[in-house]
Amino acid sequence: MKKPKGLLRIALATTALVVACGGEKADTKAPAAGAAPSTSAKGKDAITIAMIAKSSTNPVFLAARTGAEAAAKELSEKDNIKVTVNWLTPPEEDGQVQAQRIQQAVNDGADAILISCSDAGKVTGAINDAVDRGVAVMTFDSDAPQSKRFAYYGVDDNKTGQVTMAELARLMNGKGKVAILAGNQNAPNLQHRVQGAKDEAAKYPGITIAGVFNHVETPQDAAAEVVRVDNAYPDIQGWAMIGGWPLFTRALLTDAKFAKMKVVSVDAMPEELDYVAKGITPTLYAQSVYLWGDVGVRTIVDKLHFKKDVPKIIPMELVKVSKENLNAWAKQLKDWGFTNVDPKYLK
């Protein structure tokens, strides 16, 4: 697999940064999509992939779409095949709508489906039906492990929750009351992150959890929930955010109460960089969201065109982003096609 532009730069910049769980080093290397060499017999020369993310208003999934479309264009030119990505993501999170979009993709003649599941229980039946009708299904970000999907690409969600809480506990010197911001309560990946955060918090006698707070996954709704909780629980001293939703808006940059908190968040999108620079959120754990689409498309092409065997689980490693490597990460985002990276971080 071709390494996306800029990955070497950020990998070098983060060599010394260690994810605080199991001592694993964070990096941005995209894993090889196929473990076995391709056979001499080639498969499909025209592949249509229906991409169904959780929400078309969430910038992390727009980045994944960009990665998918870029990979499709590259592979089409390089390997003399026609790879098309059809974006079938609903405007808001809704597992039932996703199930309908899966059925739509099958009826439209898609060869494969690449999906991040809002609710595994609501899409597993539709995934299985698609596979039974000859459509290959791969999940990313949020899995449906009991389904007939052939592969999943994403972070270890339990570990993601653990490292987020461990870093927060470190910043708080192991004591204080914290809250967990958790997004969609039905999303299986977020459920695992919450459990990981809880398990990690239990290791610190001085850390207590005020609650787990779910919300609609838009920046505005997430920021409003943070403000509501801060007012309802004035003794909260820290936030473990298992997704970066409220930091996708600038609203909390001027919130005096929030500025006094210790905050650690998953994701590191362009909108979040100011929170790091100002010290409001000292640590972000980035998912290389562009690669959700890039690796997803390459894996599907490996399976359907090159007839490779691909692993059922393709791990993505988190990248620890702080002031020390903020500029390098900003340049990586720009290399991935983000147009809203503040120029001051690109110097």
Predicted features by range, described:
Residues 12-20:
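Hydrophobic alpha-helical targeting segments used for export or membrane insertion
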Residues 1-11:
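Bacterial N-terminal signal peptides that target proteins for export
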Residues 2-3, 19-347:
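A residue-level marker of the well-folded mature domains of exported/periplasmic proteins
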